[in-house]
Amino acid sequence: MGGVENPVSTDKAIRLPERKQYSSNAEPNPSKTEVKRRIERFPRVRIVAINSHRLPAGAARGSAGSVTGRRVRRKRMITTLRLNHPIPLFPGKQNGFVS
């Protein structure tokens, strides 16, 4: 999608769609405004808020547990959508969700 890389499937992220929130990893460079414009290209999707934070880089491990460098820092976005404006996860289902 350009900016948004993949959805996140952590314990917290699995509970977020109940509150019309979606969590995803994003490229580190785009701003919240740029990501908002890209997501709102979906038909009938309107965003209320975007929260973002950078995840720690962490150590890259080599063989035998030796530290060989640092992994790239990631950005995580939590997007809140307007009521009745869900992201269509399952096309053809009511409100984009399986009943």
Swiss-Prot record:
SUPFAM superfamilies: Ribosomal proteins S24e, L23 and L15e. GO terms for biological process: translation. InterPro entries: Nucleotide-bd_a/b_plait_sf, Ribosomal_uL23-like, Ribosomal_uL23/eL15/eS24_sf. The keyword RNA-binding applies. Disulfide bonds: none annotated. Residues 1-37 are annotated as: Disordered. Its main location: plastid. The keyword Transmembrane does not apply. It holds the Pfam family Ribosomal_L23. Residues 12-21 have a biased composition (Basic and acidic residues). Keywords: Chloroplast, Plastid, Ribonucleoprotein, Ribosomal protein, RNA-binding, rRNA-binding. Residues 22-32 have a biased composition (Polar residues). One of its GO terms (cellular component) is chloroplast. It is found in: Plastid, Chloroplast. GO terms for molecular function: rRNA binding; structural constituent of ribosome. HAMAP family: Ribosomal_uL23_B. Part of the 50S ribosomal subunit. Belongs to the universal ribosomal protein uL23 family. Binds to 23S rRNA. This is Large ribosomal subunit protein uL23cz/uL23cy. It comes from Selaginella uncinata. The lineage of its organism: Eukaryota, Viridiplantae, Streptophyta, Embryophyta, Tracheophyta. The gene is rpl23-A.
